[in-house]
Amino acid sequence: MKIADSGDAAALTAVEEACFSRPLNETQISSLLRGENTVFLAVWEGERIVGSVWLQTVLDEGYIGNVAVLPAFRRQGIADALLSALDDLAEERGLRFLTLEVRAGNHPARCLYEKHGYLPAGFRPGYYSAPKEDAVLMTKEFEHAE
């Protein structure tokens, strides 16, 4: 696993396209990679990115965007490793909490997030399209917060 940089935008886009019905495009990813408050983590298999996640921070809060693992590499611990790495980043940066959205019907992802200490914190009705679905907001608080 490594922190992705601007040269990884096309590979990150390919992962997004393989994982989501409404993926981020390369322009959006490039913009996020240039942001000083955003970090992309990528898991590599040889020369190929097989999993990624991005974290955007504002003051002492973190927002997790798009935990993505290529279908052929799922259920191998990659998402677990990405979430654990985000915990480390949150601790290093002194974040009070991390927040994410997940499709209400994506039970495997919701179970994964719960396993990592994320708790439901609210809903966003009709948040997702293609297909239309509610989002569940999930949050994880960190004990180092004062």
Annotate each PLM feature.
Residues 86-90, 98, 109:
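Short hydrophobic clusters on alpha-helical segments that form packing/core surfaces
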Residues 113, 118:
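Conserved active-site tyrosine of GNAT-family acetyltransferases
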Residues 83, 106-109, 126-131:
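Short glycine/proline-centered loop/turn elements that form peptide/ligand docking sites
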Residues 132-146:
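Terminal substrate-recognition subdomain of acyl/acetyltransferases
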Residues 101, 119-136:
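Conserved catalytic-core motifs of GNAT/GCN5-like acyltransferases
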Residues 64, 98-102:
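Conserved hydrophobic beta-strand within the GNAT/NAT acetyltransferase core sheet
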Residues 3-74, 83-85, 89, 93, ...:
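Acetyl-CoA-dependent GNAT
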